[in-house]
Swiss-Prot record:
Location relative to the cell: Cytoplasm
Residue numbers binding NAD(+): 197-199, 231, 260-265, 283, 318, 339-341, 387
Superkingdom assignment: Bacteria
Assigned protein family: Belongs to the adenosylhomocysteinase family.
Cofactor names: NAD(+)
Species per Swiss-Prot/TrEMBL record: Chlorobium phaeovibrioides (strain DSM 265 / 1930)
GO molecular function: adenosylhomocysteinase activity
Pfam families listed in its UniProt record: AdoHcyase (PF05221), AdoHcyase_NAD (PF00670)
Protein name: Adenosylhomocysteinase
Involved pathway(s): Amino-acid biosynthesis; L-homocysteine biosynthesis; L-homocysteine from S-adenosyl-L-homocysteine: step 1/1
Catalytic activity as recorded in UniProt: S-adenosyl-L-homocysteine + H2O = L-homocysteine + adenosine
Amino acid sequence: MTIAATALDYKVADISLAEWGRKEIDIAEKEMPGLMAIRNKYKGQKPLAGSRISGSLHMTIQTAVLIETLVELGADVRWASCNIFSTQDHAAAAIAVTGVPVFAWKGESLEEYWWCTRQILDFGNGLGPNLIVDDGGDATMMIILGYKVENNPSMFDKGGSNAEEKALFAQLKSIYDEDSTRWHKVAADMKGVSEETTTGVHRLYHMMEKGELLFPAINVNDSVTKSKFDNLYGCRESLADGIKRATDVMIAGKVAVVLGYGDVGKGCAHSMRSYGARVIVTEIDPICALQAAMEGFEVTTMDRAVKEGNIFVTTTGNKDVITLEHMKQMPDEAIVCNIGHFDNEIQVEPLNEYKGATKLNIKPQVDKYTFEDGHCIYMLAEGRLVNLGCATGHPSFVMSNSFTNQTLAQIELWKNDYEIGVYRLPKALDEEVARLHLEQIGVKLTTLSKEQADYIGVPVSGPYKPEHYRY
């Protein structure tokens, strides 16, 4: 990796890739009407003026459009990726040359990853962020865990239970040695965080229940125009993209096992079926299991499916969904991958420590493990996000939905003083995000008459559904 060494505040793989990145950003802007509409709406108004935003979210071409939207709205932005493999190096370079501090490159070590997260939380002169755009909750967690260890430095003695926690604690110890009240000062200045993904939202609610949340949060993930589009339709396209770029495998005729049938699992199951695979679903939730069965998918347990599958995809947000014992039983040449946020859905660490398997790297983010009996499996992206580790993530259009929500959430947090808690954007904004994307794909909306609106008890201009409505 070539580290750029100039007066600019960044660390990327290769700054010479900036021109390539800019060309792709220009293309992406045409596919992201929501973000471009927000730029036009607030042109000259700078609703985020004075804000300091730390972004911990995949540093892709689409994210570059989000970053430049936040900057155009007046924010001071620093950015890192939320996954060691998800950065598109040309996107990072293109943003870095504009003067936005970026700390991201594809293939970071865990130590480098947490160093990058540390950099985005430091705006100089003792200042931290007052807003965070988070994906998975790592930037939020660094502040909250740092706050806890400042109250109880004996936590450093434990040092973390796995490689990732050890890398995080090493950064926190370094910061503590420099300033033992750093995170108390940062937390006191925070206006809030907007969280992108299911896993990060679970973390927020868990911290709220334990009384550990230190600042307000907006749950962007559960906006309908995020979860029912990014999670579902985004995964429907990007999963197959990741698998095919990594393996060149023919999906038709294979047995694909999709673990989990939430919004992400639904997109993945339909993706694999659309390519001609026979799809088996595993689920813990009876409602989701019934949905899968009613869609025509076989629903069974992993213990039953493990000997049938040729492709295994975890989508659950839970840990140890595919165990070492499962991988020992898989058919020869099985492909194993994850599209949930963290790498602990698959027991990759126990697999790497297992003496009965040998590891051979085929190419970046593709590893072959051969077991004692001679059968092998292919692990993609080291069990991390396959669509970003082995491909380029979701298409621009669907990410425009998600990132429009993120931008609106940042404006909402900056302009208003929320109590500590986890909030959602109102239905009217959800509908507005959808409305901004209709013209791009040729949609013509029917308009209610006043009499029709009165008859069903809604305003002519919406919102059209109650808050509890399930789309």
